[in-house]
Amino acid sequence: MRKIYFVCLMVLGLSANATIQDYDLYIVSDSLNLIDNSKLPYKVFTNSASFQGKNVIYNINEGDTLRLNVHNTDSDIHHFQVKGMAYPATIIPANDSVIVEMVFPDAGSYIYYDPLNYPDNKSMGLAGMINVKDHSYSSFYWNIKDFQKSKSLNIDAGNVEVWNDYYPNYFTINSKSNPAINADTDARVTGSVGDTIYIYMVNTGQSIHSMHYHGYHLEIMHSSHEPSHVGRIKDTFPLYPMETLVLRLIPDKPGEYPVHDHNLVAVTANMVYPNGMFITLLIAD
């Protein structure tokens, strides 16, 4: 095991309540069960050595240190990196582990991923989210992905993939599609009229997704792609590959309202509608 410290230098003004959050993280390979009962070769970052369908979602506070003991249970070398953090990728040999340590001084959402042979390993599933909070409001988390099944099978077979002809045919939030996604308590937005609700979104796929909210307008609190858009209030939010958004919702009426990708092919699973990127908000009086 190697121990590697990466400390962000922008530490002025960090909270006196900042803590060190320490976790084990495992790279595990298996298959993802898709909504049409087919399987997709898949790799994930999990919190145990057993396969779990979705990547771990980390939630920490502004100024906290995140210390991860990353175990590679796979037979291949993998890398670990957090997009936007100023340090190189960490190499993790097969059946070995490393410790990485990072300080997060700024609130927002960050993507951790495997950049090796980019985007192959990331497209096989190895990309998750780290959410850095400056509030204590109810929060929900969406890790958005898209897959072209034939490419996943080709990479899994050890072949070289070409990405200039990418046509994804499966689309997930937290590794689930409609209707299964509504059973995911991390993703399914619930609350009451007048609540303050935060929605953290990362796009770890290869396509742009334009997420459209019915029923409400939301405020942009963080945008990695367009920081100047913070404060804008609207109902549709483009989310570019490997970029992040944090939105704030204060519901003004009760009801159940859909959220879906405006690129309607992403609301399908292998062209079956609406088995893709479609979820509902459930707001009580």
Where in this protein do the model-derived segments appear?
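Sec-dependent N-terminal signal peptides
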Residues: 4-14
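N-terminal, post-signal-peptide metal-ligating segments of extracellular/periplasmic oxidoreductases
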Residues: 18-88, 99, 132, 155-198, ...
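Generic beta-strand/beta-sheet core signal
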Residues: 28, 202, 212-214, 262
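Short acidic, flexible loop segments centered on an aromatic residue
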Residues: 81-86, 208-219
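Long, repeat-rich segments with strong aromatic
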Residues: 197-211
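Extracellular/periplasmic metallocenter environments
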Residues: 75-78, 87-150, 237-285
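Intrinsic, low-complexity N-terminal interaction/targeting segments
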Residues: 218-237
